């Protein structure tokens, strides 16, 4: 039976793509698909987040992008300014369900945070997750300020009846400061869900083979890895 997992985060530029790639790489014995509902800020032909996941994770990954908008804005704004049709949650759900018929694991990577709008009616990634009845993995920064943002994201999930599968730190410094070290213990409390990994800062710059080889060390057993809090 296929698994669909939605990957969201507390904001933008926090490591959602590298975390998605790590989860895909850790599932190396599975047929994995990565679905990017809305890619913004790239011109046609430029490699997007889904393609980057496939580059990092390996050849067992199928990369799919539903829509692309040229300006680096929220999907609803980018679609409106480009005069293009926005992405709708039902389209995301249908695409994920179709991929699930041919893959063991489908990862749906959102844009920005959980409640970034897909369209001018206010639809979000959370609506797609609800249509799919899929759990949500939250990617969070390591440092100061992450506890509040993580708690707000988890609260938004709970208020919509969605399952927060856990939290993964998207970019863990090689020499973490005091806040980052303390947050290893405090993030699960803020989220009401387990901390399931910490991807090292700069991992996305690794060659694909090195990234894929290291991914299991960065993720907890629940995500196919061997990571445990306190281990880097």
Residue positions per predicted region:
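Switch II (G3) loop of P-loop NTPases
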Residues: 92-121
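Charged helix-capping and loop-helix junction motifs
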Residues: 120-127, 151-154, 180-185
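N-terminal phosphate/diphosphate-binding loop that engages ATP/GTP or pyrophosphate donors
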Residues: 18-86, 90, 95-98
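Short internal beta-strands
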Residues: 36, 137-140, 165-171
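Glycine-rich phosphate-binding P-loop
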Residues: 6-21
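Inter-motif core of Ras-like GTPase G domains
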Residues: 119-142
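Short, structured coil segments at secondary-structure junctions
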Residues: 57, 132, 190-193
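C-terminal lobe/tail of nucleotide-utilizing enzymes
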Residues: 155-232
């Amino acid at each position: 039976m296929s698994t669909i997992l939605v990957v969201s985060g507390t904001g933008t530029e926090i490591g959602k793509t590298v975390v998605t790639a790590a989860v895909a790489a850790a599932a190396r014995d599975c047929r994995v698909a990565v679905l990017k509902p809305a890619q913004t800020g790239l011109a046609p032909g430029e490699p997007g987040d889904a393609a980057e996941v496939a580059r990092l994770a390996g050849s067992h990954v199928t990369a799919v992008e539903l829509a692309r908008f040229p300006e680096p804005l929220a999907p609803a704004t980018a679609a409106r300014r480009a005069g293009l049709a926005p992405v709708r949650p039902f389209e995301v759900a249908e695409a994920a369900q179709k991929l699930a018929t041919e893959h063991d694991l489908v990862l749906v990577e959102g844009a920005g945070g959980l409640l970034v709008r897909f369209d001018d009616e206010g639809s979000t990634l959370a609506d797609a997750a609800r249509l799919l009845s899929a759990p949500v993995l939250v990617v969070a920064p390591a440092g100061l300020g992450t506890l509040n943002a993580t708690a707000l994201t988890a609260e938004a999930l709970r208020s919509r009846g969605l399952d927060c599968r856990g939290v993964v730190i998207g970019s863990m410094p090689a020499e973490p400061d005091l806040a980052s070290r303390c947050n290893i213990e405090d993030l699960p409390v803020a989220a009401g869900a387990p901390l399931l990994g910490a991807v090292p800062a700069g991992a996305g710059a690794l060659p694909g083979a090195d990234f894929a080889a290291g991914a299991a060390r960065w993720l907890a057993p629940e995500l196919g890895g061997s990571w445990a809090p306190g281990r880097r």
